[in-house]
């Protein structure tokens, strides 16, 4: 019994008024979790390539303008068959080049300054440029079919200026077709990106409104609970 009482006496309960000799435990603030890396989507990929798309359109426009200038300065368009030089008589290498250069220039400027009027202007210019490029592709394909049909008739002809012009312009038309397809893809991709950006900017205020409602809803519920608990006491 004595040993049991001694063992109980040795067990001293801690006094809350006495300062504990044990070292204070430092409370470490939980470091905030690292933000997850942004999800890679087609829009993030296009955002990195916007200036490249604009530069592509400018380059395509300048090359088409050079081709049109060379043909119109070397050849008299009115002296040859209309089917062979249909593209140049309609002036596509000139007005198409102007639209490509303009849309490419606005694309680069709007990406660097990112103001509202430049963004809207670049969007409209690229829509017009994509329509012009689609029209140009149809015209180029039609011109190629006319050239191939004309060159088939040149097999039995030894010397003919029209056949030489047809073979020369066919090579230029093929290169312009490739460049126009490239400009069309650039304009369409830029247009899709800008339209997606416009739609996302319209959704942001609604999302913020829902976030504010979610933040304030616990406060409102707490006030309602306090009002319900205080009403029986008042009665």
From Swiss-Prot:
Phosphoserine, modified sites: 217
Protein name: High affinity immunoglobulin epsilon receptor subunit beta
Organism per entry: Mus musculus (Mouse)
Cytoplasmic topological domain residue ranges: 1-51, 110-122, 192-235
Keyword Protease: no
GO molecular function: IgE binding
Compartments where found: Membrane
Region (Disordered): 1-23
PTM notes: Phosphorylated on tyrosine residues by LYN.
Keyword Disulfide bond (UniProt): yes
GO cellular component terms given for this protein: external side of plasma membrane; Fc-epsilon receptor I complex; membrane raft; plasma membrane
Biological process (GO), any one: cell surface receptor signaling pathway
Residue numbers on the Extracellular membrane side: 72-89, 143-171
Membrane topology (UniProt): Multi-pass membrane protein
Similarity annotation: Belongs to the MS4A family.
């Amino acid at each position: 019994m004595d040993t049991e009482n001694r063992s109980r006496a040795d067990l001293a309960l801690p006094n809350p008024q006495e300062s504990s000799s044990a070292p204070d435990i430092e409370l470490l603030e939980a470091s905030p979790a690292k933000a997850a890396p942004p999800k890679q989507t087609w829009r993030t990929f296009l955002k990195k390539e916007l200036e490249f798309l604009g530069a592509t359109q400018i380059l395509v426009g300048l090359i088409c303008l050079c081709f049109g200038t060379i043909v119109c300065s070397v050849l008299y368009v009115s002296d040859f068959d209309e089917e062979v030089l249909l593209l140049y008589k309609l002036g596509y290498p000139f007005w198409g080049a102007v639209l490509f250069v303009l849309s490419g220039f606005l694309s680069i400027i709007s990406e660097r300054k990112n103001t509202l009027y430049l963004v809207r202007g670049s969007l409209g210019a690229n829509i017009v440029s994509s329509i012009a490029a689609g029209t140009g592709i149809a015209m180029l394909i039609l011109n190629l079919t006319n050239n191939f049909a004309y060159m088939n008739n040149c097999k039995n002809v030894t010397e003919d200026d029209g056949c030489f012009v047809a073979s020369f312009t066919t090579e230029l038309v093929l290169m312009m077709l490739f460049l126009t397809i490239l400009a069309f893809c650039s304009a369409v991709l830029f247009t899709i990106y800008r339209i997606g950006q416009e739609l996302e900017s319209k959704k942001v205020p609604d999302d913020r409104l829902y976030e504010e409602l979610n933040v304030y809803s616990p406060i409102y519920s707490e006030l309602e609970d306090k009002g319900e608990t205080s009403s029986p006491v008042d009665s």
